[in-house]
Amino acid sequence: MSWGTELWDQFDNLEKHTQWGIDILEKYIKFVKERTEIELSYAKQLRNLSKKYQPKKNSKEEEEYKYTACKAFLSTLNELNDYAGQHEVISENMTSQITVDLVRYVQELKQERKSNFHDGRKAQQHIETCWKQLESSKRRFERDCKEADRAQQYFEKMDADINVTKADVEKARQQAQMRQQMAEDSKADYSLILQRFNQEQWEYYHTHIPNIFQKIQEMEERRIVRIGESMKTYAEVDRQVIPIIGKCLDGIVKAAESIDQKNDSQLVVEAYKSGFEPPGDIEFEDYTQPMKRTVSDNSLSSSKEGKPELKFGGKSRGKLWPFIKKNKLMTLLTSPHQPPPPPPASASPSAVPNGPQSPKQQKEPLSHRFNEFMTSKPKIHCFRSLKRGLSLKLGVTPEDFSNFPPEQRRKKLQQKVDDLNKEIQKETDQRDAITKMKDVYLKNPQMGDPASLDHKLAEVTQNIEKLRLEAHKFEAWLAEVEGRLPARSEQARRQSGLYDGQTHQTVTNCAQDRESPDGSYTEEQSQESEHKVLATDFDDEFDDEEPLPAIGTCKALYTFEGQNEGTISVVEGETLSVIEEDKGDGWTRIRRNEDEEGYVPTSYVEVYLDKNAKGS
């Protein structure tokens, strides 16, 4: 099968077909280019995804990756990054092995096609020229023959006419002979050109066109083979990265299999273990005995040994004690200390605080009661610890990590000691290196001045001394913590509320069990334990008592947001219960729905005191 013999008359169609083949090849190149762009975009998105979920340095997330599940996730992210790299390899290989080669091949193919069809058109033009020459000689021969016939007929006519002179007859005869000769010459020329054309036409259809079409056929077949090879390469590029992608997936599976739930559980224990013992049982208090009730064993009141006893004046302790349940102490400590805000500019004249309808109540101000409570010496140390604990909530971490539970504090101190030892070792190595260099300079003065190293050596030595002092300080704290951790029976006993006749030990060790020598443990997860020394002591005494009774009502004149601790928000026109009158500091204590209470500016409410409350 040959296009030269089978398609000898389909020159134009072959030209269109070969152009279509080049278009198909360019279309495939465009497809591969778009595939490479997709692979690059996909790889970029995968890398961004992996980077997005990587733990941030020096953040809490980085600490979370000590758990095996988080480590496995981190390994998954790293494997995903390698997975993305393989898609980049696919893109690069497709570009270098397919796109670049095909683009170059298309240019060569276009040039070869152009050359072949140029030769074909040239041969076609040549045969057309020969055909035109043949037609021209044929027409000339035909014309000369007709002219010769007319000249012969004219001569015969003149020769038959007796009236024509002999000279005219001779002239007609010569003209007929000339025309006859011209016809013979045209015939010979036509015969020669016809013979030549037939030769050219045979060569055109049996030699030139078959050769040209054969080249075009070979060119087209090479194009088809090349596009097939490119498709194979396309598949092989993908196949080459499959083993590596499989390794990435195997890495993810291996990371998943490395997850150890027991190990993670142990890490949680190590991270959050406080070192405290759980509280013991609470002793039954018999209220049927006709005796004066005392506060619970681990409260801050005086012991049976005659130590000063905390007095709460007034008829009702619930009325005088400004705390309720778990938040009793915190309510006292977080009550507003700043002056109340002034009322809005549209204050009505009727809203006059502390007017005739608000006589002064016969009770000591809350601040006076708190000061009296604080002056009890056995309690001062406990409250000082609590005060330090509350100050730590501002975000300042003590140097000795006293805001951490004992177990966590020990780990922090141990880590600090290890870090300092590493720094000491680093500085020591540097000092040794400088000393050796100085010895070299002393032996070989031409290499350097030994005195130039004295300043650096003194600086490094000073740094070592500072670090050693720092390490010694933390080691002392660490030894103190490690020495206290085993002694937990007394601590549990103190937390349980058992009264053993040693209240002075409770008071003395109140802060020591809850704090380090320079601060108290006040982390949010253990805030309740932090003030159990206070809150637990008083909960037994006051949990069963009724809330402070209402001494009147009030109507909100303006809306108050109540954003500070100890305050409560009110809405204009709202009616609430008054449980404590203004003591001269500009704040009135109110209650809503028997469970919400707090302070509002006296100028924001209109107070109506009960007559019975005024007289009490």
UniProtKB/Swiss-Prot annotation:
Predominant place of localization: cytoplasm
Tissue-wise expression: Highly expressed in brain and lung. Expressed at lower levels in colon, heart, kidney, liver, small intestine, spleen, testis and thymus. Isoform 1 and isoform 2 are the major isoforms in brain while isoform 5 and isoform 6 are the major isoforms in lung, spleen, testis and thymus.
Subcellular location: Cytoplasm, Cell cortex; Cytoplasm; Cytoplasmic vesicle; Lysosome
Entry GO CC: cell cortex; clathrin-coated pit; cytoplasmic vesicle; cytoskeleton; lysosome; plasma membrane
F-BAR domain location: 1-264
Modified residues (Phosphotyrosine): 499
Key words, A-Z: Acetylation, Cell membrane, Coated pit, Coiled coil, Cytoplasm, Cytoplasmic vesicle, Cytoskeleton, Developmental protein, Differentiation, Endocytosis, Lipid-binding, Lysosome, Membrane, Neurogenesis, Phosphoprotein, SH3 domain
MF term (GO), any: lipid binding
Annotated stretches, region: Interaction with RND2: 399-551
Region feature (Interaction with microtubules): 1-334
Annotated phenotype, changing residue 601 to L: Abrogates interaction with PDE6G
Region of interest (Interaction with ARHGAP17, DAAM1, DIAPH1 and DIAPH2), residue spans: 549-616
Residues carrying the site annotation Mediates end-to-end attachment of dimers: 166
Matching InterPro entries: AH/BAR_dom_sf, F_BAR, FCH_dom, FNBP1_F-BAR, FNBP1_SH3, HR1_rho-bd, SH3-like_dom_sf, SH3_domain
Annotated region described as Disordered, given as residue ranges: 280-314, 332-365, 494-531
Region (Interaction with DNM2 and WASL): 552-608
Regions annotated as coiled coil: 67-259, 398-490
Pfam families: FCH, SH3_1
Free-text note regarding domains: The F-BAR domain binds the phospholipid membrane with its concave surface. The end-to-end polymerization of dimers of these domains provides a curved surface that fits best membranes with around 600 A diameter, and may drive tubulation.
Family from the record: Belongs to the FNBP1 family.
PANTHER family recorded: FCH AND DOUBLE SH3 DOMAINS PROTEIN, FORMIN-BINDING PROTEIN 1
Name listed for the protein in its UniProt record: Formin-binding protein 1
Species: Rattus norvegicus (Rat)
Gene coding for it: Fnbp1
